[in-house]
């Protein structure tokens, strides 16, 4: 009998609302469904305007796949699950990098860490990021049947 390994994975994709150069607002996904937990990913963004004093981080969950289309998902295809604002340093320009890091734990906690020069802010959401015990058991049962040829 082959050994079957079941891994805990994200049940949804998570990203932030971003404004693109063409003015469109889309979800920029950082982490994707079916990625193994725990996971940590960082992306760099930039202020939309010169001398922008604050940014609003809007976090969305959605079902996008980790492919070219999934990197930019329409906002109406996602559900907003949290938001927060962060002050930007004085003198921030459109070229000032803003690092956004998503950390998803096996315990079902999603943390968004945002940093820009000397400013930092964190926001945590307890969410159903992972498969439930029932879903894991069901997957394990299916895998065992596949491996055993039943």
Which sequence ranges carry the predicted segments?
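Acidic low-complexity intrinsically disordered segments
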Residues: 1-150
């Amino acid at each position: 009998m082959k050994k079957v390994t079941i891994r805990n994975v994200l049940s949804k994709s998570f990203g932030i609302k971003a404004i693109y150069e063409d003015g469109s607002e889309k979800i920029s996904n950082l982490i994707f469904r079916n990625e193994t937990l725990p996971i940590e990913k960082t992306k760099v963004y930039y202020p939309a305007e010169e001398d922008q004093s604050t940014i609003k981080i809007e976090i969305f969950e959605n079902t996008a796949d980790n492919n070219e289309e999934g990197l930019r998902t329409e906002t109406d295809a996602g559900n907003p699950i949290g938001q927060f604002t962060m002050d930007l340093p004085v003198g921030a320009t459109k070229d000032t990098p803003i690092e956004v890091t998503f950390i998803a734990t096996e315990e079902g906690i999603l943390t968004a860490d945002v940093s820009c020069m000397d400013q930092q802010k964190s926001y945590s959401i307890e969410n159903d990021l992972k498969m439930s015990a029932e879903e894991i058991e069901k997957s394990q049962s299916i895998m065992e049947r596949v491996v055993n040829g039943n």
